[in-house]
Design a protein with these regions (language model features):
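Short, well-formed alpha-helical segments that are part of the catalytic scaffolds
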Residues: 24-43
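Conserved donor nucleotide-binding strand/loop of the catalytic core
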Residues: 59-88
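Catalytic-site signature of metal-activated, phosphate-bearing donor transferases
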Residues: 79-86, 93, 104-265
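A conserved acidic beta->alpha catalytic loop
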Residues: 40, 51-61, 74, 98
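Cell-envelope/extracellular polymer assembly enzymes that use nucleotide-activated donors
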Residues: 20-22
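Short beta-strand/loop segment that forms part of the nucleotide-sugar
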Residues: 25, 44-53, 70, 98-99
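Acidic helix N-cap motif at the loop->helix transition within catalytic regions
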Residues: 33-35, 56-65, 106-107
Length: 265
């Protein structure tokens, strides 16, 4: 059972030019992460958790931490879930987080300053990826710049799985980092592996894309070569090799699923 205390959220009272920041966190069975994620976002005026019918203590921990929790079925569409969150707050500025991410103090201070100045811009932030306790510097993990902080009325999300924020505002770099604890257990890794490869195959199938068996055979070795050699995964040691091999398997799995989906048509 989780227990602990949380710092109070930032007090905006008394400011003449009040600009509210909302932090949006999508969750599904994230009891191991949600507490630390919310603690890192204590600079915000509001923290909103959009929960996909978690079966663990995610909702209870989030509510105890001071977040507003809304249950809303994901239905395999991450972009739609993020766009739904836009309708659930009146905040002027939005920061989107994943439950396994943490905001550095420097980034939080920068966002408070930006919200007070209220420029017409969107902000990308550097993400530091940590897999199984190891900070990842190569293998496609850097540079990892995420467009996450922007005025509420200036963004829409697109994409079923690896969704992207779309905005017409100029994009600037935000000082500070997000720390992304991307994988903490192999069970969690393979849960996401299966979920994401299925969703990506479904998205491509729905878009009318096809896959030859030659692609099933040839793309995985190239995916490994790109990750391990071209992107420097070899410099990450044993974990770099393991993740490179699984990256190839990930590539194969999504194309195998697409191949057999189209075979049923």
């Amino acid at each position: 059972m989780w227990g602990g205390s949380f710092p109070a959220m930032h007090d905006w009272s008394g400011k003449e030019d009040f600009v509210k920041i909302a932090v949006i966190i999508l969750t599904h069975n994230e009891e191991a992460h949600i507490g630390a994620c919310i603690r890192s976002a204590a600079f915000a005026d509001e923290i909103l958790v959009i929960d996909d019918e978690s079966e663990d203590l995610t909702r209870e921990i989030a509510a105890e931490a001071g977040a507003r929790v809304i249950s809303h079925l994901l239905a395999g569409d991450f972009a739609a879930q993020r766009n739904f969150a836009l309708t659930q707050t009146t905040a002027d500025w939005m920061l989107y987080l994943d439950a396994d991410e943490r905001v550095s103090p420097a980034a939080g201070e920068t966002m408070r300053r930006i919200a007070e100045e209220n420029p017409k811009a969107a902000y990308e932030i550097k993400r530091v990826n940590i897999a199984f306790g190891q900070k990842m510097r190569y293998g496609g993990h850097r540079p990892d710049l995420c467009l996450r902080f922007f005025p509420r009325d200036a963004v829409r999300w697109e994409g079923l799985v690896h969704e992207r924020a779309r905005t017409e505002l100029p994009v600037r770099r935000l000082a500070g980092e997000l720390y992304h604890y991307t994988y903490t257990s192999w069970d969690r890794y393979f849960q996401k592996f299966n979920q994401y490869t299925t969703l990506m195959a479904q998205r491509q199938h729905a878009a009318g894309k096809t896959c030859s068996f030659a692609k099933v055979l040839l793309d995985p070795p190239f995916a490994f070569f790109r990750f391990y050699i071209l992107q420097g995964g070899i410099l990450e040691g044993r974990l770099g090799f393991v993740l490179g091999a699984f990256h190839a398997f990930y590539t194969m799995a999504k194309y195998v699923k697409l191949y057999y989906m189209q075979a049923k048509d």
